[in-house]
């Protein structure tokens, strides 16, 4: 049996998906994609480029599923730890409902994921990435780095007179 999380994910059949997620994690910027597009010469090149870029699109719910499998946590436990209603959490994980930035941040804390993974999740959810110059975001980043719980992060936010992660 493979020993690293990455190898285990590949072993259980997540190879293609893992590669797509890695492409997102490598953060192909709009500028890079635009540069590639400008360099195309022929219609056939455009067709190939469109096929390659559309196949690299990962949805929020697919990424959440990937993170869930990577973490080894159960969806119900993540929802509980994130203080997200089980039905609403299930809908987010299935892709039938969207989530606010704060809800995604609570899920990130419950999943114990990295700042980088959190920012990818936020971008896929149509939200702004965490920005360390913002007090609120800096506290959340600290919580992510130190695997703090949602109540712990809320306490830190409260101590600094900032809005809480929970509505």
Name each region found by the language model.
Residues 76, 87, 116:
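Key DNA-contact positions within bacterial/archaeal DNA-binding proteins
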Residues 68, 79, 108:
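The alpha-helix within a helix-turn-helix
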Residues 1-59:
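N-terminal flexible/basic segments that precede or flank functional cores
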Residues 5-6, 16-17, 22-27, 31-34, ...:
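Short, charged recognition helix plus adjacent turn
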Residues 39-74, 156-166:
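A short, Lys/Arg-rich alpha-helix, primarily the initiator
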Residues 74-81:
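Short alpha-helical "recognition helix" segments of helix-turn-helix
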Residues 96-109:
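Short, basic-rich loop-to-helix N-cap that marks the start of a DNA-contacting helix
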Residues 83-99, 124-126:
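Recognition helix of helix-turn-helix/homeodomain-like DNA-binding domains
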